Amino acid sequence: AAGNAQVDNFGRGGLGGDAMRAEALDYSGTNNANMSTPADGAPPRMQMYRFVNRGVYASAPGVTFTYPPAGAQFGPLAFDLTAEVVVAEPTDGCVALTNSASLSGKIALIDRGTCEFSAKVLNAQQAGAVGVVIVNNVASAPAAMAAGMFGSSVAIPAIMVAQADRPALTAGGVVLRMQGSNA
């Protein structure tokens, strides 16, 4: 199969007449996209769903955030949570956390790293955390976090903040308010 998805292949092989059908802002779903790729000669179809731009906010006394926080595409969409921030151990959150006694009822601060976001948040949830702040690992704006393999198992909210915000959040005794809205 040539997989060229166009009406005229200009003599370069494959069957013609299979122009791609791209459906932008398809309202049959949200926060996703898919593509069907039939055999050569039949038109492929791409559906790009509407992405929900939820509002995510964070505030803490004495903390000025570099960028607005970003939300997660998993866990609760609407939340309003206030708790003390505690650094997770290990800080990348990729394995079971070892400081569950300190995290119980708190917001876990986890560094962005090599494993998927939902694995980090699930590990914090299993350690007793009520929310998660993931700190970006590059000096740029936080990015929305995809659900990954464990997204459907996560029941606590998560946000991402800028790398520059880490020192203020790890100063000790910081009480953070995290808010999310699905509107």
What residues fall within each predicted segment?
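Structured lumen-facing ectodomains of secretory-pathway proteins
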Residues: Y49-A183
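Extracellular zinc-dependent metalloprotease catalytic-domain scaffold
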Residues: A1-G55, S181-A183
